[in-house]
């Protein structure tokens, strides 16, 4: 049974105080520090895609992966440009 079934519907409400913008800035800074200014990045455990979308907006070719189909469906509902592959 998917532990996140049902929880995906309220996940973003529980996570609304998470500093995703700060996390994204830190990750982008770290990637650039190591010579990765763009290109493919895999977000394992992407949940509803909040961080994934922010990283895509920074120019990374994002793929989001999550074990929960419900979380992935929520992430796909938020699909923006550039497109993100969710698996």
Language-model segments: what does each one mean?
Residues 1-9:
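N-terminal, positively charged/glycine-rich alpha-helical extensions of SAM-dependent methyltransferases
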Residues 8-18:
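Class I SAM-dependent methyltransferase Rossmann-like catalytic core
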Residues 19, 47:
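Conserved acidic
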Residues 20-38:
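Conserved alpha-helix/loop element of class I SAM-dependent methyltransferases that forms part
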Residues 38-45:
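Conserved class I S-adenosyl-L-methionine
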Residues 42, 50-87:
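Class I SAM-dependent methyltransferase SAM/SAH-binding core
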């Amino acid at each position: 049974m998917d532990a996140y079934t049902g929880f995906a519907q309220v996940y973003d409400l529980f996570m609304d105080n998470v500093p995703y913008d700060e996390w994204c800035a830190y990750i982008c800074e770290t990637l650039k520090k190591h010579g990765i200014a763009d290109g493919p990045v895999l977000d394992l455990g992407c949940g509803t895609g909040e961080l994934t979308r922010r990283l895509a907006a920074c120019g990374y070719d994002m793929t989001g992966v999550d074990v929960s189909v419900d979380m992935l469906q929520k992430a796909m509902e938020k699909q923006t440009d550039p497109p993100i592959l969710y698996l």
